[in-house]
Amino acid sequence: MQYKTKAKKSLGQNFLQDENIIRKIVQLANIKKHDIVIEIGPGLGALTRYLLSSSNNVSVVEFDASVIDTLIANCQKYGTPHIYNQDFLKFDISSLENSSNQKIKLIGNLPYNISSPILFKVIKDSDKIVDAHFMLQKEVVERIVSLPNSKSYGRLSVILQYHFDCSMILKIPPEVFYPQPKVDSAILRLKPKNSKELLKNYNFFEEIVKQSFAQRRKTLHNNLKSILKERKIDPSTLPVDTNLRAENLSVGDFVSLANFLS
């Protein structure tokens, strides 16, 4: 592996370089020869090499043009990925040549500074994917997989758990990266749910969740006061107890609340 390229702090780059960890990630992602794989932010190709050894159809989306020559050189012995030099947030997954309409496996060491926008984009593309395996800050993964009544349970937990079965499958120490980040990392697995509770208005559901967690220490009654007043709704008629805080409600509770208020 060549590591000639200096990591760019502005892009949140931390290059993975531990071969054992990389092999473990690919193994956990259960990638087969026939799978269509998209890697987000391949960097210098440490993970890409192993993906090319596992699948016949690997595409990479890399925003930083300066790493692409090194990426190609590092992958040469393993194969050639389809390279898209663009921002994943603007990337159209359906633009991939895929005559069989086969669903896609997403994988990547996500830049810390834009991990949340990427996750919200993946929500929009959830009908096109089999699963996703992302390396993120461990703290972020813990928030995503958190259950109600915990301090780390929040907006990200509710929204992602509505769409996916979410699990933390591997913890990763800082020492396996170049340069070393100041935080621990973890692998998040997202598997789209086969069936989701029906929502009357998804955008309104997102807004209710956002408002409910706006001030964590306040009750739902206080956080949703303006919405309840605008709709002239008596809080006692709601399907949830508004004296609770948002962190006490399950994903299903938020669905019921949003549907009632829609």
UniProtKB/Swiss-Prot annotation:
S-adenosyl-L-methionine binds at residues 14, 16, 41, 62, 87, 109. PROSITE patterns: RRNA_A_DIMETH (PS01131), SAM_RNA_A_N6_MT (PS51689). SMART domains: rADc. Pfam families: RrnaAD. Keywords: Cytoplasm, Methyltransferase, RNA-binding, rRNA processing, S-adenosyl-L-methionine, Transferase. One of its GO terms (molecular function) is 16S rRNA (adenine(1518)-N(6)/adenine(1519)-N(6))-dimethyltransferase activity. The keyword Cell cycle does not apply. Gene3D superfamilies: Ribosomal RNA adenine dimethylase-like, domain 2, Vaccinia Virus protein VP39. The keyword Transferase applies. Its EC number is 2.1.1.182. It is found in: Cytoplasm. InterPro entries: KsgA/Erm, rRNA_Ade_diMease-like_C, rRNA_Ade_Mease_Trfase_CS, rRNA_Ade_methylase_Trfase_N, rRNA_adenine_dimethylase, SAM-dependent_MTases_sf. GO terms for cellular component: cytosol. It catalyses: adenosine(1518)/adenosine(1519) in 16S rRNA + 4 S-adenosyl-L-methionine = N(6)-dimethyladenosine(1518)/N(6)-dimethyladenosine(1519) in 16S rRNA + 4 S-adenosyl-L-homocysteine + 4 H(+). NCBIfam families: ksgA (TIGR00755). Specifically dimethylates two adjacent adenosines (A1518 and A1519) in the loop of a conserved hairpin near the 3'-end of 16S rRNA in the 30S particle. May play a critical role in biogenesis of 30S subunits. Belongs to the class I-like SAM-binding methyltransferase superfamily. rRNA adenine N(6)-methyltransferase family. RsmA subfamily. PANTHER family: DIMETHYLADENOSINE TRANSFERASE, DIMETHYLADENOSINE TRANSFERASE-RELATED. This is Ribosomal RNA small subunit methyltransferase A.
